[in-house]
Design a protein with these regions (language model features):
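Auxiliary, metal-adjacent structural segments of Zn-dependent hydrolase domains
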Residues: 1-33, 67, 156-198, 442-444
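Non-catalytic terminal regions of proteins
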Residues: 40, 44, 60, 246-456
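Short, flexible loop/turn elements at secondary-structure junctions
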Residues: 30-32, 55, 195, 213, ...
Length: 456
């Protein structure tokens, strides 16, 4: 897909301009882990990437609870091969343009193709391929059942013999009530199972994008931890190699220059500031956990009585295995790291003319900064909460979704391109209603209705 080429060119240009301290590396969470290293890397960079990716990222993939729950390292490579072959076959049969348009729409919604509260049952790629034909035929019969129009008998009139029985209406579509009966947060799954106009091959591609989005779901919640863990171990391993005399001073100087560039955190008033560097934040917290275990201060014993003075390896492994970014920061961000990174809290209220410095470096401020920073890494804050609430199967077949607005934050400018892609997949009008505290704040439609064009 063209989006991957766009991403590759962006990384390539940044690398050529020297804007990446760590060499570009590719690591696949498979079993065994597969890592790709650039041929033009220096010896130091090859050693660094091996320590960072093959040891750091690999151990995080194998240990963290989110990856253990949501990913199946045994079968991902086989499934990627299956997906590539299937999409190539679709391009040959239906044309590149048709497949690309479908992938555009699926990629726009891929963050809404995740079951956040269910654990998928992993199956092998062979079983996936074996089930494909059966799934295509079954899904099409289910969709035909969903959208079949059968007149309901008048009230008080018994159905004719041989008419629709409960066995012929497994979804309960002709018994009244709203469909779906409960809001659905997995938009791609709902599209795959219920879109009335999609062909079987299109449903399979929606499924492929949905399964890959599910596979990458843990990475979206653990970037700070994952990169911090990898940086901690490449720093630890490289220093151990030097201490044991296996590398010389020249290689270490080259390493330290690269490492410093990776974990650099520009100040808020720097022209290069673009937010918190996840490498810097994660590395600082993991290094601080080790310090608290090895040489705790009185402040550390007050804030972290459970880990102060404990064995650092066990504590680090516990932190790596049992947290995601949000809970990791809430649990382990210390006052020292807050001071070192010079963190403070600004409140920018759209209903107040002035900015407020809401937290500084005191006991109360440390807690507020930690709470505010951890909440920024919660998916519920970073991504809009959008759910399917109704498909008008007896009316115009339109699809209605609700967006639960938080803290008066409206949807961004990309809302119309996204619902256009959703309408392309669904095939009928799409209505998106933003709500906060039970009140409607705005309505979006595609195709665009006249009253929404002038809405503010």
């Amino acid at each position: 897909h063209w989006s991957f080429g766009k991403q590759f060119l962006s990384v390539e240009q940044a690398y050529k301009r020297g804007q990446m301290g760590l060499a570009y590396e590719l690591v696949i969470n498979s079993n065994p882990c597969i890592a790709y290293l650039m041929e033009e890397n220096t010896l130091m960079m090859q050693v660094l990437v091996i320590a960072h990716a093959c040891y750091g990222h690999n151990s995080f993939f194998k240990g963290n609870y989110l990856f253990r729950t949501w990913t199946d390292a045994e079968s991902i490579v086989d499934y990627l091969v299956f997906a590539r072959k299937y999409i190539a076959q679709c391009e040959e049969r239906h044309g590149v343009h048709a497949v690309e348009q479908l992938l555009d729409a699926c990629h726009a919604l891929q963050n809404y193709g995740v079951d956040r509260y269910k654990r998928p049952s992993p199956i092998s790629a062979e079983e996936e391929a074996k089930r494909q034909d059966e799934r295509e035929a079954y899904l099409q019969t289910q969709v035909n059942m969903l959208w079949r129009t059968i007149p309901e008998p008048p009230a008080g009139v018994a159905p004719l013999p041989g008419s629709l029985h409960s066995d012929d209406d497994p979804l309960g579509l002709h018994t009244g009530g709203r469909y779906p009966s409960e809001p659905q947060e997995n938009l791609l799954y709902f599209i795959e199972k219920n879109a009335p106009l999609l062909a079987p091959w299109q449903r399979e591609i929606v499924r492929i994008v949905r399964k890959l989005a599910q596979y990458f779901y843990p990475q979206r919640q653990t970037q700070v931890m994952n990169e911090g863990w990898a940086c901690f171990w490449h720093y630890t391993l490289m220093n151990r190699l030097y201490d044991e005399g296996k590398v010389d001073e020249g290689l270490m100087l080259e390493f330290l220059q690269s490492h410093a560039a990776v974990i650099n955190q520009p100040g808020f008033d720097s022209p290069y500031y673009s937010g918190l560097n996840p490498y810097a934040l994660g590395f600082a917290i993991f290094m601080d956990i080790k310090r608290i275990c090895d040489a705790p201060t009185a402040e550390d014993r007050e804030w972290f009585p459970d880990i102060a003075g404990s064995p650092w390896r066990e504590t680090l492994e516990f932190a790596m295995r049992n947290f995601k970014d949000e809970s990791f920061i809430q649990q382990f961000l210390s006052p020292k790291v807050i001071r070192d990174l010079k963190l403070f809290l600004i409140v920018d209220d759209d209903q107040v003319e002035m900015l407020e410095v809401a937290a500084i470096h005191d006991d109360r401020g440390y807690k507020r900064i930690r709470e505010a920073l951890s909440s920024q890494y919660a998916l519920s804050v970073r991504e809009p909460n959008i759910q399917v609430v109704e498909a008008a199967i007896r009316g115009d077949r339109s699809l209605t979704l609700h967006h639960i607005q938080d803290s008066r934050r409206p949807l961004g400018r990309s809302v119309y391109p996204v619902i256009r892609h959703l309408q392309q997949l669904w095939g009928f009008p799409v209505h998106l209603v933003s709500m906060e505290d039970g009140k409607v704040t705005r309505r979006y439609h595609w195709p665009v209705e006249e009253e929404s064009k002038g809405a503010g």
